Amino acid sequence: MLSAGLGLLMLVAVVEFLIGLIGNGVLVVWSFREWIRKFSWSSYNLIILGLAGCRFVLQWLIILDLSLFPLFQSSRWLRYLSIFWVLVSQASLWFATFLSVFYCKKITTFDHPAYLWLKQRAYNLSLWCLLGYFIINLLLTVQIGLMFYHPPQGNSSIRYPFESWQYLYAFRLNSGSYLPLMVFLVSSGMLIVSLYTHHKKMKVHSAGRRDVRAKAHITALKSLGCFLLLHLVYIMASPFSIASKTYPPDLTSVFIWETLMAAYPSLHSLILIMGIPRVKQTCQKILWKTVCARRCWGP
C-alpha cells in the first residue's frame, strides 16, 4: 500500500516527465522545422537541437532508473544505464555551455584582442571541445564503468552495488563536468560585465530610450541563471539519490531526490521556450486551441 507522500511524489514525477517530454519535444520539432524552412542549420538551432535532444533522453533515463532499480538493483544493465546517464548528462551540460558562449558572442561587445580572437574561432573551438569530450569521457567511462558494480569487498557488496566506495568512481565519472561548467561561468560572467558596462553607457547617452541590447542581456542571463540553479540542484541531489539506493533502499527518498533531479531537464525546457518568441507564440496558439476545443466538446 502506497503512502500519501509517496503517491504525491509519483504524481509530481509523472507531471515533470510530461512537461519535459512535451517541452523538449517542441524544441526538437522547432529546430527541424527551422532547418526545413531555411534549408540550412544555424549554430543556434544546432545548439537547441542538441540540448533538447539530450534533455529528452535524460528524462527517459530518470524514469527508467525509477522503474528498474527496485527490480534489478544488482543487474548489469543498471551499470550500463549509469554509464550512459553520465555521458548524456555531461553532453547536456556541454550544449548549455555552447548556448552561453553563443549568447556571449552575439550580445557582448569587448575590444580586447583575446576576446576578438576567441569570438572569431568560437564555432571551431566548440566542435573540437565536443569531440574531445566524447573521446575523453568514452575512455573514462569504459575504464571506470567496468568496475562500477564490482567492488573489491567480496560477494556481499556485489549483491548491493550502491556502497560508499562508489562515490569515488561517481566523482571520477563526473569529472568531465568541470571544464564546461567553468566555461559556462566565465561566459555568463562576461555577459554580466557587458550588461553593467552597457547600462552605464546608456544611462549617460540615451536616457529614456528603449534599450534593446539591455533587454537581450537580461533575457540571456535569466535563461543561463535558471539553468545554473537547476543544474546545481541536479548535481547536489545526485549523491543523495545514490545513497538512498543502498540496501535496504528507501523508495520515498529515491523519489524525493530523483524528482529534484528531474526538474533540471524538464523545467529548463520551458524557460528556453519562453525565451524564443516564435516557439512561445506557437505554444500559446496550441494551448489556446486545446482549451477552446475542450470547451466546445466538454459537458
Swiss-Prot record:
Glycans are attached at N155. It is found in: Membrane. Coiled coil: none annotated. Keywords: G-protein coupled receptor, Glycoprotein, Membrane, Receptor, Sensory transduction, Taste, Transducer, Transmembrane, Transmembrane helix. It holds the Pfam family TAS2R. InterPro entries: TAS2R (IPR007960). It is a multi-pass membrane protein. Residues 23-45, 104-127, 197-223, 275-299 are cytoplasmic. The chain crosses the membrane at residues 2-22, 46-66, 83-103, 128-148, 176-196, 224-244, 254-274. Residues 1, 67-82, 149-175, 245-253 are extracellular. Most taste cells may be activated by a limited number of bitter compounds; individual taste cells can discriminate among bitter stimuli. Belongs to the G-protein coupled receptor T2R family. This is Taste receptor type 2 member 5.
